């Protein structure tokens, strides 16, 4: 199930996230296995605590209003921290699945918050025959499993997103190839 929640974040919240994070973008791209562009891990950047709290408030609302009812997690859960990503024109996120287990924790939902309106840059789920248009403030929630492989199309303008994963609290997975 792929959920689209238009205008979940307000124009003001989106602007606060974008303006808060941009000064912390690295000068050069730090290699990641499936994404072009530049990233900032908000939750691991002490100077971004205000942005981290703002995003946490949005994710708490998402958890309470949507995720708890749609995904019905079996255990206490929370998110895994927040990653901001900037794609320059023509850059993409390559086809991949997010994976159910990462860094020893069990994921059950992927969350993407679009921070810009774009022509192009659609989030594509080929197996589900679904494309999601980037619209500032829209949240997309989907399973991290192999059933929901995805990629993005290139955009003609800068595209900005924020990502997190909902994970089970206190449940550690060991002995699994990651």
Task: Tell where the protein language model's regions lie, with residue ranges.
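Catalytic core of Fe(II)/2-oxoglutarate
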Residues: 107, 118-178
């Amino acid at each position: 199930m792929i959920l689209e929640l238009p205008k979940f974040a307000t124009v003001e919240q989106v602007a606060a996230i974008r303006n808060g994070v941009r000064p912390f973008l690295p000068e050069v791209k730090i290699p990641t296995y499936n994404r072009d562009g530049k990233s900032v891990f908000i939750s691991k950047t002490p100077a971004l605590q205000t942005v981290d709290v703002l995003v946490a408030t949005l994710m708490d609302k998402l958890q309470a209003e949507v995720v708890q009812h749609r995904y019905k997690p079996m255990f206490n859960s929370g998110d895994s921290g927040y990653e901001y990503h900037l794609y320059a024109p023509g850059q993409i996120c390559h086809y991949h699945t997010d994976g159910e287990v990462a860094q020893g924790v069990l994921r059950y939902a992927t969350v993407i918050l679009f921070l810009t309106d774009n022509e192009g840059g659609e989030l594509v789920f080929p197996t589900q025959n679904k494309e999601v248009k980037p619209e500032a403030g829209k949240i997309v929630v989907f399973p991290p499993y192999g059933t929901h492989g995805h990629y993005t199309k290139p955009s003609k303008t800068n595209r900005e997103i924020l990502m997190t994963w909902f994970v089970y609290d206190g449940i550690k997975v060991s002995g699994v190839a990651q």
